Amino acid sequence: MKTHVKKGDEVEIIAGRNHKGKRGTVLAVNASKGTVIVEGARTLKKAVRPTEQNPEGGIQEINGPIHISNVKKVG
């Protein structure tokens, strides 16, 4: 799939009930799935089990993917 944005671009989210109008920087592009990850736009909470690297575990916030058709390049 051809993409109009790349990693590091400034984008605005143009569709979506909770995220419309937000701006951020593209952290990653997945061309095969047609999604992008925008910094601070769609934060998800993920439960993490305790491991040796993270002995406390708990809830971690991560950035979720947004379909590439829902973002517009700014500037």
Swiss-Prot record:
GO molecular function: any one?
structural constituent of ribosome
GO BP, sorted A to Z:
translation
Query: Cellular component terms, GO, for this chain's entry?
Result: ribonucleoprotein complex; ribosome
Asked whether the UniProt record includes Cell membrane among its keywords, one would answer no
What keyword terms does UniProt attach to this protein?
A: Ribonucleoprotein, Ribosomal protein, RNA-binding, rRNA-binding
- What is the similarity comment for this entry? Belongs to the universal ribosomal protein uL24 family.
In terms of HAMAP family, this protein maps to: Ribosomal_uL24_B
The annotated subunit structure for this chain is: Part of the 50S ribosomal subunit.
Record's function text:
One of two assembly initiator proteins, it binds directly to the 5'-end of the 23S rRNA, where it nucleates assembly of the 50S subunit.
Protein name, per record: Large ribosomal subunit protein uL24
